[in-house]
């Protein structure tokens, strides 16, 4: 799939390479089979070069950040994975003594960025203080919590266009944000970095939000157990999926080692050795029960790789 010459070229341009790695070691669900190669570009230039080389050779690939919103087959996978692990640089620009523009590369931890900015008195990303994952994944899916979403603070995003091999800038309107969606999910663009606009606020008020959001997350979500986060998108504003699943008596229900969380029924956890089949079977079971009872079609929120 990747020739020795290409390996040497990628390495020379700043990519570490690992072979036959199991993706379960790179995901929060702890499920995922082996891939032929994982590439770890150390700079954005190395990332762009790797993308260009793979596209030119028609080598299939996927991008992984912190692996927190993925459900991956445990069978051998036939694509290359590019990790944004080392793409964690940030730049800061103050505006008018009140606003701050932050440019963060795609691999920056979203929760770490939230805390960093909050500690300096900048408001806007408090909602992300407990969201696992990277900036790239957060913008890709317009992640949100507690009334906030990525679209509220994004100014623009730098992307690599797979169609013509050019680096481009997309503004907020170009990104076509929706509920847990963006134009990035259509597959033509790979996110490189994003600029955010934050507002100065009282530190006391910011810290109060952080404490509130963090406490609620710890109390209500199984964040200490392997999962892929919320399994289903909310189909409409007044339809609460976790509450619905709980009311159907499914809290704690298991198939194999995959279990509907006893803490929050909107999550499926890995009790230890769950398989991809266990998880998918449980998802399909819940979807069928909800459809039969409420005539609502649930959509899965995490990406599924197979």
Curated annotation (Swiss-Prot):
Its cofactor is FAD. It catalyses: UDP-N-acetyl-alpha-D-muramate + NADP(+) = UDP-N-acetyl-3-O-(1-carboxyvinyl)-alpha-D-glucosamine + NADPH + H(+). Coiled coil: none annotated. It comes from the Bacteria. One of its GO terms (molecular function) is FAD binding. Pfam families: FAD_binding_4, MurB_C. InterPro entries: FAD-bd_PCMH, FAD-bd_PCMH-like_sf, FAD-bd_PCMH_sub1, FAD-bd_PCMH_sub2, MurB, MurB_C, MurB_C_sf, Oxid_FAD_bind_N. It is an enzyme of class 1 (oxidoreductase). Keywords: Cell cycle, Cell division, Cell shape, Cell wall biogenesis/degradation, Cytoplasm, FAD, Flavoprotein, NADP, Oxidoreductase, Peptidoglycan synthesis. Residues 30-216 form the FAD-binding PCMH-type domain. The keyword Hydrolase does not apply. It is found in: Cytoplasm. SUPFAM superfamilies: FAD-binding/transporter-associated domain-like, Uridine diphospho-N-Acetylenolpyruvylglucosamine reductase, MurB, C-terminal domain. The active site is at residues 180, 230, 301. Its EC number is 1.3.1.98. Pathway: Cell wall biogenesis; peptidoglycan biosynthesis. One of its GO terms (cellular component) is cytosol. Cell wall formation. Belongs to the MurB family. This is UDP-N-acetylenolpyruvoylglucosamine reductase. It comes from Petrotoga mobilis (strain DSM 10674 / SJ95).
């Amino acid at each position: 799939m990747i020739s020795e010459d290409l390996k040497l070229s990628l390495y020379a341009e700043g990519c570490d390479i690992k072979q036959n790695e199991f993706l379960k070691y790179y995901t929060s669900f702890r499920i995922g089979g082996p891939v032929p190669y994982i590439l770890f570009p150390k700079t954005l230039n190395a990332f762009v070069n790797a993308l260009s080389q793979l596209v030119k050779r028609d080598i299939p690939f996927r991008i992984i950040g912190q692996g927190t919103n993925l459900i991956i087959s445990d069978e051998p996978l036939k694509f290359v994975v590019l990790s944004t692990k080392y793409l964690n640089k940030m730049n800061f620009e103050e505006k008018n003594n009140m606003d701050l523009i932050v440019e963060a590369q795609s691999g920056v931890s979203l929760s770490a960025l939230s805390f960093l900015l909050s500690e300096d008195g900048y408001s806007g990303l408090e909602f992300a203080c407990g969201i696992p994952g990277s900036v790239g994944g957060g913008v890709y899916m317009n992640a949100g919590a507690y009334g906030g979403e990525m679209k509220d603070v994004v100014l623009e995003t730098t992307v690599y266009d797979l169609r013509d091999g050019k680096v481009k800038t997309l503004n907020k309107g170009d990104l076509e944000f929706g509920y847990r969606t963006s134009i990035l999910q259509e597959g033509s663009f790979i996110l490189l970095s994003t600029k955010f606009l934050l507002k100065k606020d009282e530190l006391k008020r910011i810290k109060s939000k952080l404490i509130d959001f963090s406490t609620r997350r710890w109390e209500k979500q199984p964040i200490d157990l392997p999962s892929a986060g919320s399994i289903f998108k909310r189909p409409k504003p007044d339809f609460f999926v976790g509450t619905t699943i709980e009311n159907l008596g499914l809290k704690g229900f298991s198939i194999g080692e995959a279990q509907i969380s006893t803490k929050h029924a909107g999550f499926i956890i890995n009790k230890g050795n769950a398989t991809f089949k266990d998880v998918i079977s449980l998802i399909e079971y819940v979807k069928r029960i909800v459809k039969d009872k409420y005539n609502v079609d649930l959509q899965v929120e995490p990406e599924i790789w197979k």
